[in-house]
Amino acid sequence: MAKSDMLPFLAMVLVQIGYAGMNITSKMAMEAGMKPLILVAYRQIFATIATFPVAFFLERKTRPKITLRILVQVFFCSITGATGNQVLYFVGLQNSSPTIACALTNLLPAVTFLLAAIFRQETVGIKKASGQAKVIGTLVCVIGAMVLSFYHGHTIGIGESKIHWAYAENITKHGSSSGHSNFFLGPFLIMAAAVSWAAWFIIQTKMSETFAAPYTSTLLMCLMGSIQCGAIALISDHTISDWSLSSPLRFISALYAGVVASALAFCLMSWAMQRKGPLYVSVFSPLLLVVVAIFSWALLEEKLYTGTFMGSALVVIGLYGVLWGKDREVSEKEEEREKVKQQNHKVKSESNEDIESRLPVASSGNGSTRSTSP
């Protein structure tokens, strides 16, 4: 693998490992008693602090003017991409498991395709193989999500992990006895989070056409998200002790979610997309499911069910169907552009030959002929 291919590959693997760590640490913090809305508020605050120097030093000379229209678009980005997405996701994570949460997150490309088609940012092309793959892949993703949500089945006997530590074991036992989990509400909220996240893609794509400053827009989005999430968390829980970060687990999970899973992840994904495109970045999302499933089994003693395995497999298969269709569509468009380019070149050549054939011919002094300009 060439160096130009190796660096984006390593960056995206690092992002998925970072997201896996966020799911594990956040689940442990919530099992230990941290409220999900408070965790989301701290995540936005830490993400704002971490993103500020990146946006300031990298875009202070190239940043377009921030107009009222841009601020309105950023506000809707914060509602969908920060507040709505993360509040729904973390409450859903509290009421499910990290493995199910990550599996349902793979619905994002399919949901994004549906919304993009509705808002005419994506063409379906049902008569072409690319369009058929996107539609079928979306349907398979939805079926997989339904299996994950409503069918558990039998436990898969893969044995017990020998490396989990007592701290995580005590937390998960305490959490399981507290009755927080709701394996119907949790998946539903995570699917709603995927819809909110997909809506952010639609709004962000529109905004990037006039405001090409991704780090600054992320900074503003996180800042507005901090205010929104902070207000929601204060209304729902204004007990001072619940906001305390004196516990190392609470502080680490909030700091990790903000710095690694928000600020660092966005920078690495933006860098990879500039070099390889968004499709390349999307292909790595199923890796998160594999990493989290291993970590959850090893560290949190999470049991794997046949329904989880079957639903996850369907979601991943459907995801790659959508991505294959998108990649095929890009290839088809490039082929069409190349054909148009060749046709234009052919027409231009024939036109030049026709013009030359129509030029008058004049005799030179030595009896030969030459063309004269009109």
Swiss-Prot record:
Keyword GTP-binding attributed: no
Primary residence: membrane
Comp. bias intervals (Basic and acidic residues): 330-357
Pfam families, A to Z: EamA
Ranges where the record places region Disordered: 330-374
Polar residues composition-biased segments: 363-374
Membrane topology classification: Multi-pass membrane protein
Record-annotated disulphide pairs: none
Keywords attached to this entry: Coiled coil, Membrane, Repeat, Transmembrane, Transmembrane helix
Spans through the membrane: 6-26, 37-57, 70-90, 99-119, 139-159, 183-203, 215-235, 251-271, 279-299, 304-324
Subcellular location: Membrane
InterPro entries per record: EamA_dom, WAT1-related
Gene Ontology molecular-function annotations: transmembrane transporter activity
Any one Gene Ontology cellular component term annotated for this protein: membrane
Domain EamA residue range list: 19-149, 195-323
Coiled-coil segments on the chain, per record: 325-354
Annotated family: Belongs to the drug/metabolite transporter (DMT) superfamily. Plant drug/metabolite exporter (P-DME) (TC 2.A.7.4) family.
Protein name: WAT1-related protein At1g09380
UniProt lineage: Eukaryota, Viridiplantae, Streptophyta, Embryophyta, Tracheophyta
